[in-house]
Amino acid sequence: APRTIGVDINPHAVAYAHAVNGVETVRSDLFSAVSGKFDLILFNAPYLPTLPEERIDDWLECALDGGVSGRDVIERFLPQALSHLTDTGRILLLISSLTGLLETVSLCAACGADAAVCAEEEVEDGEMLYVLKITRSLA
């Protein structure tokens, strides 16, 4: 049977998603508390470059803090997500131009995955948001 599961490290987000949408939710740091394979994995990663001195110990800030490069969480996510992806599955990953589009695509390639922009939108001050469609490399 198809299974939909929402995962977040923020306990407030997990409780809210379950209450509002009624979907199965799990509090987890990425896939640490998740098992199984999935046909589709969606990830709105913390993608904003954040210097150590800019860090605030707050759940909302945690949702945005992508580390110095903006890719710290994405670097941990990709190998884990690929190990939870079915052979024909795909990942949709939201990133920002501040995160580095080419650098993120290169990370995917280093993990044995192909990545292509499937949607983009300018948000403000020239910042672009991209949705990357990521699949296992066939080569």
Task: Give names to the regions the model predicted.
Residues 71-133:
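Conserved Class I SAM-dependent methyltransferase catalytic core
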Residues 6, 66, 93:
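Conserved SAM-binding loop
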Residues 2, 25, 62-66, 85:
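Short glycine- and Lys/Arg-enriched binding-loop motifs that mark or flank ligand-binding interfaces
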Residues 10, 29, 59-62, 98-105:
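A generic short-segment signal for beta-strand/edge and adjacent turn/coil regions
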Residues 45-73:
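Mobile active-site "lid"/loop adjacent to the S-adenosyl-L-methionine
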Residues 137-139:
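Flexible, glycine-/basic-rich loop-and-beta segments that form/coincide
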Residues 1-56:
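Conserved SAM/SAH cofactor-binding pocket of Class I
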Residues 36, 66-70, 100:
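Glycine-centered flexibility motif
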